[in-house]
Amino acid sequence: MKLGVTVLSVALLVAALCPPALSAPMGSDPPTACCFSYTLRKLPRHFVIDYFETTSLCSQPAVVFQTKKGRQVCANPSESWVQEYVDDLELN
């Protein structure tokens, strides 16, 4: 039972920390990072070192956090913890 819960927890964590998908508009413009889903869990603040917001070319708005390990995680910009992290990163 404990092994199954551990495996499920690890699988959910890996899925939450997957990098966002890339989509490229037609033409010679460089690729644009877009998010098609958001992380379901709040990231530990000490994992996050930077962020950027997706452009208006993307179908849905997102904040993309970069972790210490170089992963990019899509987050919902309307969630309070996301806004708090963005404010904190702007101040530092």
Curated annotation (Swiss-Prot):
The gene is CCL4. Keywords: Chemotaxis, Cytokine, Disulfide bond, Inflammatory response, Secreted, Signal. Homodimer. The keyword Nuclease does not apply. CDD domains: Chemokine_CC. Residues 1-23 form the signal peptide. The keyword Secreted applies. Monokine with inflammatory and chemokinetic properties. GO terms for cellular component: extracellular space. Belongs to the intercrine beta (chemokine CC) family. Pfam families: IL8. One of its GO terms (biological process) is antimicrobial humoral immune response mediated by antimicrobial peptide. Disulfide bonds join 34-58, 35-74. It is found in: Secreted. This is C-C motif chemokine 4. GO terms for molecular function: CCR chemokine receptor binding; chemokine activity.
